[in-house]
Amino acid sequence: MSLYYIDGNSLTLDMIGRITADKEARVALSEEASARCRATRAQIDRWMEKDAPVVYGVNTGLGNLKDVVVPPEKHIEWNKTLPYPHAAGMGEYLPPEVTLTSLLLRANVLARGYSGVRPELIERILSIYNAKVAPAVHSEGSTGLSDLGPLAQNVMTVAGLDEAKAYYRGNLLPSREALRLAGLAESFTLECKEVLAQMNGSTMTQAIAVLAFLRFEELASGIEARLSSGGELPEFYEGCREVIGFTKGVLNRENNISCDNPLLFELPKGGYEAVMGCNCSNTQVGYAMDMMNTVLAELANGLHEKTGGLAKSEARHLLNKIKTCAMQVSADSIPTKGGQEDHVEFSFTAARKFYYAVELTGKLLAL
């Protein structure tokens, strides 16, 4: 069995690829990360006292209810209701590999310590990941500015709420049953800010993008071999290579960011301050996904030209579908949350299109 530690700073695409490929791999929280989380969690507990200042997301409502103060004695009960209004979704479920990877990525985000959650929560998430209990998450319903809907559905499985569902050993089950069969506690009590800290980020988008990119890397050598002529690649491939390298850098960086709002920063004289900087945004991944979809359309053109015979018709069909994925998504923006979230980048849609386009490119390469 291979054991990997996450610390919020060093989770790379290559590491995710190794963990995903190794069915016996296990992931744990590093001691250093655990200590950081305990320090910031102590500050959250202090803000739950009656004479504490008003801190968004800790003792207030969310979104356009940001100015509504929630008394400490009501907060735990209110906290339990948070996933429900956000966990709306439509469409088929995302692939289990996506939601599993989102658990790993979210645990790494929280391990940085800036969100103020207990280490026990991160350990709970990792135990679910290690047991391969994949939350059932609808594929429609996120703008990419914080994957609130998809991540709220993750939260419901982590907490073991009655309405949640999950995949376990190929079967779709109520989450509590899946957790029990995996040898885990059926429920887990989420404390102050721990629902928000799990929902408030674009981690489902990141998971889709990461898995699609890893799959693309698996196809890359085959694409190069098909496109080469006399050992030389076409000139346009160098431009593709630039975008591929840029995207890998973006995804590696985004694996290890503090994707939450607010974040806790240590003060020079001790204690922490809560900083509201909308760090739930994922604009850069949306841009990278749009560029990669353009790259795939270009590569698919080349693969199509190398395909002959009876397969030509199938190749044209696949090429057309890949090209439709190259239509830009992240240039759009429609305000949400009563106008409180006034810029959304739809990176979730861009990442899903990339995931699909990679799948189509694999089929085209196989012709």
Spell out what each predicted region is.
Residues 64-79:
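Glycine-rich loop at the start of a catalytic domain that most often binds anionic cofactors/ligands
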Residues 199-207, 267-276, 338-346:
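Short, charged/polar, low-complexity loop and linker segments
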Residues 87, 91-95, 99-224:
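Active-site cavity-forming subdomains of large catalytic enzyme subunits
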Residues 221, 225-304:
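Accessory "access/gating" subregions that flank catalytic or transport cores
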